[in-house]
């Protein structure tokens, strides 16, 4: 099998035990040899001018394809690469990653080309999460290379699309290799051109142990050009190490997550008010059409973007009535029944950080007695499980407590009986929550048995879902599906959990007051 086939198969080894043993075998003369190679054959002393030499144009702030302090001073502080995250924090993240590797190791992080909706129509671009975490760079088709040069240091290289006046006229500004160091704090910047790709290839080949640590394989066009440099190179995943670093959030990240949660929470408040107003209007007028799920979905999306969010965290669930029985219902195209509940699971992404909230509220603005009984049961589980979000617990241990509480409520309501306690799974089929961060389902390599530590963020989302066709349930509860979800920061010992989504109303009295416009 040729090497490029090996690359495309990307045979992953998650063994980390070889790192320490490999480190002890690195010799000083190897470092000297590599240093000479870097300075000569790679020509790393090349640098680019950032000055505008076109005398025929008026001078203007340099646009690099994303917000900078120079072009967006109202968004970014002087030392920030992205909103809320300074250049130093990005450097610290790279340092944390490289501490896991022996001298001479090479880590390479790829971000793929822009995904296309059709032949020449692109999807809205979202940067690869790990690439964003390590660089803050927001263009497709880029390669980050990190080379461990000593026990305490590494060198960083960023290869990007070159600037192209004609293409930028159509698709917007690019950074170009010449601006990488200034704006992103990367040691060396290069363009992904035929001239510079051999430099990338030699960097990858320079690994002293014959291993490359990657997040994924390069895209096909780049892969073909790198093939001559990759003979006898083995590829290992760096995904778990990156996720381990991402699992615990910095103070700056928690602030960004709080902002994301507050934007989404406030938008839930406004969406409840909108739903109450529209539903009241349509119910009192024979000429008005009933509210549709897609109208509620669209209004929420407008609210979060109006407050500065870049996008939704995921396709929202806006499920009226029995649609709430489908956990990931995303068609959002059914008319809302005035007497039904509306289960809405939605969040936003604010500068790379996500929120994930579920609220359930009555289309009419007023809970029925049966709806209130089930809702209070779910809310009770939500609150008690939030109290358990402390160091030493696990998502699994909190889930077991949620099962115990759900079982008790379902028995009390007459939905399950003592002889079949495991029937709770029919009405509560999912886990209590998941890790949350830059991705909605964050750090997926880590199971729910990991001991929670300060700075981790998880969701707490108990639910009870009853089909309107379930004849085993008292009739008054049929068709009631309720979930209440919040985002919670694990605090330091002896402190209370921080609920990032505290602005999303969840008490019955508060919801009814908002929806009646009181």
Swiss-Prot record:
Reaction(s) this enzyme catalyzes, per UniProt: Release of any N-terminal amino acid, including proline, that is linked to proline, even from a dipeptide or tripeptide
Binding-site residues, substrate: 314, 345, 356, 434, 441, 461, 485
Subcellular location: Mitochondrion; Cytoplasm
Known EC number: 3.4.11.9
Any one Gene Ontology cellular component term annotated for this protein: mitochondrion
Free-text comment on the cofactor: Binds 2 manganese ions per subunit.
Residues that bind Mn(2+) 2: 345, 356, 485
Any one of the GO BP annotations: proteolysis
Pfam family, one: Peptidase_M24
Chain sites annotated for binding Mn(2+) 1: 356, 434, 461, 485
This protein's UniProt keywords: Aminopeptidase, Cytoplasm, Hydrolase, Manganese, Metal-binding, Metalloprotease, Mitochondrion, Protease, Transit peptide
Single Gene Ontology MF annotation: aminopeptidase activity
Superkingdom of the source species: Eukaryota
Chief localisation class: mitochondrion
Enzyme class label: hydrolase
SUPFAM superfamilies, alphabetized: Creatinase/aminopeptidase, Creatinase/prolidase N-terminal domain
Disulfide bond entries: none
Cofactor: Mn(2+)
Subunit details: Homodimer.
Function: Catalyzes the removal of a penultimate prolyl residue from the N-termini of peptides, such as Leu-Pro-Ala. Also shows low activity towards peptides with Ala or Ser at the P1 position.
Descriptive protein name: Xaa-Pro aminopeptidase 3
Organism: Dictyostelium discoideum (Social amoeba)
Gene behind the chain: xpnpep3
């Amino acid at each position: 099998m040729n090497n490029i086939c090996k690359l495309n198969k990307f045979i992953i080894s998650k063994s980390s035990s070889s790192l320490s043993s490999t480190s002890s075998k690195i010799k000083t003369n190897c470092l000297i040899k590599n240093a000479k190679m870097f300075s000569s054959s790679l020509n790393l002393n090349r640098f680019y001018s950032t000055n505008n030499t076109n005398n025929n144009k008026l001078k203007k702030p340099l646009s690099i394809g994303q917000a900078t302090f120079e072009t967006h001073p109202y968004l970014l502080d002087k030392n920030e690469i992205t909103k809320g995250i300074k250049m130093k924090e990005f450097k610290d993240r790279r340092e944390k990653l490289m501490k896991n590797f022996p001298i001479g190791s090479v880590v390479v992080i790829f971000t793929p080309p822009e995904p296309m909706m059709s032949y020449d129509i692109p999807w809205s671009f979202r940067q690869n999460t790990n690439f964003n975490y390590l660089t803050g760079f927001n263009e497709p088709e880029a390669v980050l290379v990190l080379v461990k040069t000593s026990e305490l240091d590494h060198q960083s290289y960023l290869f990007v699309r070159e600037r192209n006046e004609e293409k930028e006229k159509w698709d917007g500004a690019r950074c170009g290799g010449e601006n990488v160091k200034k704006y992103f704090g990367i040691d060396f910047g290069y363009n992904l051109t035929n001239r510079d790709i051999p430099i990338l290839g030699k960097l990858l080949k320079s690994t002293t142990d014959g291993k490359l640590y990657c997040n994924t394989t390069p895209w096909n066009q780049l892969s073909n050009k790198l093939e001559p440099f990759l003979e006898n190179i083995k590829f290992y995943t760096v995904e778990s190490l990156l996720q381990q670093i991402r699992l615990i959030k910095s103070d700056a990240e928690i602030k960004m997550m709080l902002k994301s949660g507050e934007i989404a929470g406030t938008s839930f408040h406004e969406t409840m008010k909108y739903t109450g107003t529209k539903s009241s209007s349509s119910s009192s007028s024979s000429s008005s059409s009933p509210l549709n799920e897609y109208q509620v979905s669209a209004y929420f999306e407008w609210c979060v973007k109006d407050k500065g969010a870049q996008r939704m965290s995921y396709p929202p669930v806006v499920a009226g009535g029995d649609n709430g029985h489908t956990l990931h219902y995303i068609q959002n195209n059914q008319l809302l029944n005035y007497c039904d509940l509306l289960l809405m699971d939605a969040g936003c992404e604010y500068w790379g950080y996500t929120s994930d909230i579920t609220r359930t509220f009555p289309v009419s603005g007023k809970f029925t007695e049966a709806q209130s009984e089930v809702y209070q049961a779910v809310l009770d589980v939500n609150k008690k499980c939030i109290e358990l979000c402390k160091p030493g617990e696990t998502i699994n241990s909190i889930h077991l407590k949620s099962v115990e509480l759900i079982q008790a409520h379902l028995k009390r309501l007459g939905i399950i009986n003592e002889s079949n306690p495991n029937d709770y799974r029919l009405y509560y089929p999912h886990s209590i929550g998941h890790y949350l961060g830059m991705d909605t389902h964050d750090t997926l390599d880590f199971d729910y048995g990991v001991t929670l530590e300060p700075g981790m963020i998880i969701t707490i989302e108990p639910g009870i879902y009853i089909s309107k066709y379930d004849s085993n349930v008292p009739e008054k509860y049929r068709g009631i599906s309720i979930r209440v979800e919040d985002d919670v920061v694990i605090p330091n010992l002896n402190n209370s959990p921080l609920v990032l989504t505290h602005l999303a109303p969840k008490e019955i009295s508060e919801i009814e007051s908002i929806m009646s416009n009181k």
